[in-house]
C-alpha cells in the first residue's frame, strides 16, 4: 500500500511517517507539509491512501483534493460541520474512494468519550476541561467537541 502523509512535520504526521517507514508492506508515497502541493504530489507519486493531519481552515479543500486525486482519505483534522460531512459523502459516492474522519486516534481518548457519553445519562451537570501544549492549533480540541456532542446525543443539555 502506498501512503502519503499530509501535515508530515506536525506531531501526529511525523509519527505516521515514522510508522510507515518502519513497515515492509507500506510504502511512503509522499510527505507533504506547508508550502508543498498535495495535488502535485498525488499527480507525480500516486497514493492509495492519504493520511491528513493539517489545519481545520483547509479541511474541505484537502479532502476534495485527496478523493479527486484518486486516493482514500484518513483524516485527523477537525472542524467538520454537518454540511461538510454531507458534501464529503457526495464526493465519496462520486469518486468511489473512502474517507475516514476521526478527531482523535488515541484509543484511551476514544474510550473516554464512550465513558463520558454513558455517564451523561446519569448527571445533570458536566464540564470538559482540557490542558494542551502551547502550540496546540485547535482549541477547543476536536476531541473535546466530539465528547460534548456524544454527551448530548440522548437529548441531554449541558450549559
Model feature map: region roles:
Residues 19-40:
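NAD(P)-binding Rossmann-fold cofactor-contacting core
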Residues 1-18, 29, 120-159:
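Active-site-lining helix/loop region of Rossmann-like oxidoreductase modules
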Residues 72, 87-106, 122-126:
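Rossmann-fold dehydrogenase core element
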Residues 43, 49, 53-76, 85-87:
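Rossmann-fold NAD(P) dinucleotide-binding segment
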Residues 34, 78-80, 104-106, 131-134:
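Short, ordered loop/turn segments at secondary-structure junctions
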Residues 64, 77-99, 115-118:
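Rossmann-fold NAD(P)-binding glycine/threonine-rich loop
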Residues 6, 53-54, 76-77, 102, ...:
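Structural motif
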Amino acid at each position: 500500500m502506498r501512503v502519503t502523509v499530509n501535515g508530515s512535520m506536525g506531531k501526529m504526521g511525523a509519527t505516521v511517517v515514522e510508522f510507515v517507514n518502519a513497515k515492509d508492506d507500506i510504502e511512503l508515497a509522499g510527505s507533504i507539509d506547508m508550502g508543498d502541493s498535495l495535488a502535485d504530489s498525488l499527480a507525480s507519486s500516486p497514493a492509495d491512501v492519504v493520511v491528513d493531519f493539517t489545519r481545520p481552515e483547509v479541511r474541505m479543500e484537502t479532502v476534495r483534493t485527496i478523493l479527486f486525486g484518486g486516493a482514500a482519505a484518513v483524516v485527523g483534522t477537525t472542524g467538520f460541520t454537518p454540511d461538510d460531512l454531507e458534501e464529503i459523502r457526495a464526493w465519496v459516492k462520486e469518486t468511489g474512494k473512502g474517507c475516514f474522519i476521526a478527531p482523535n486516534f488515541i484509543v484511551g481518548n476514544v474510550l473516554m468519550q464512550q465513558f463520558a457519553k454513558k455517564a451523561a445519562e446519569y448527571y445533570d451537570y458536566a464540564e470538559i476541561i482540557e490542558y494542551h501544549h502551547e502550540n496546540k492549533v485547535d482549541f477547543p480540541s476536536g476531541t473535546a467537541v466530539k465528547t460534548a456532542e456524544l454527551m448530548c446525543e440522548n437529548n441531554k443539555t449541558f450549559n
